[in-house]
Amino acid sequence: MAIKFQYNKTSLGDLGKQLKMRQKALPTIKSKESALRSEVKKAKDSAGDYRRRLDRLKAEYDYMVSLWGEFDCDLLRIADVELSVQKIAGVRTPVLQDVKFEVKPYDLFSSPVWFADGVDILKRMAQLGIEFEVYNRKMELLDYARRKTTQKVNLYEKVQIPGYEDAIRKIKRFMEDEENPVSYTHLTLPTILLV
């Protein structure tokens, strides 16, 4: 990225301010990147943990697969999922507060005995599935913010700060040359030939 500037004191002052601003902001942005990196790892680990727990729960009840055919799917429905927002390093992330289920009344005497257990199993599976999705979304949001922050750090470190320093150096050299012009008028002819 080429920095546009003019060879004058005003431009020199503006570039100096821009350089100082970026140099002051860089440590803050780096610490944000570090915090986001650790939060992404935590969210990824939590999502993986919920995924493993859900898989274990499914595996525990694989023996009931033949029974699920007679289970009435309308017995249980998710009524509400309560989410709140938590800011982590300036990024708004979802936090699961509560999952509310609606259980349709059923006759305990005419329905199979395991229906009550089936409703509990489905509640736990749904709860784990929703928690997994929330942590997965949290991880995606944090990872996106981390990538953007990393890009900004790289832009500042590798492009803008060196560019501003180079522009300031060029302006200073130009201004020094303007102030101290080289004059050959004081040299005599024999001196010029000796040089």
Please identify what each model-predicted range represents.
Residues 1-16:
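N-terminal juxtamembrane/topogenic regions of multi-pass membrane proteins
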Residues 185-191:
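Conserved small/polar residues in nucleotide/adenosyl-binding loops
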Residues 12-29, 33-36, 40-57, 61, ...:
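Amphipathic alpha-helical coiled-coil segments
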Residues 83-143:
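Charged, well-structured binding/catalytic surfaces in domain cores that contact anionic ligands
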Residues 51-101:
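Long, charged all-alpha helical bundle/coiled-coil segments in cytosolic proteins
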Residues 181-183:
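Acidic, proline/serine/threonine- and glycine-rich low-complexity intrinsically disordered segments
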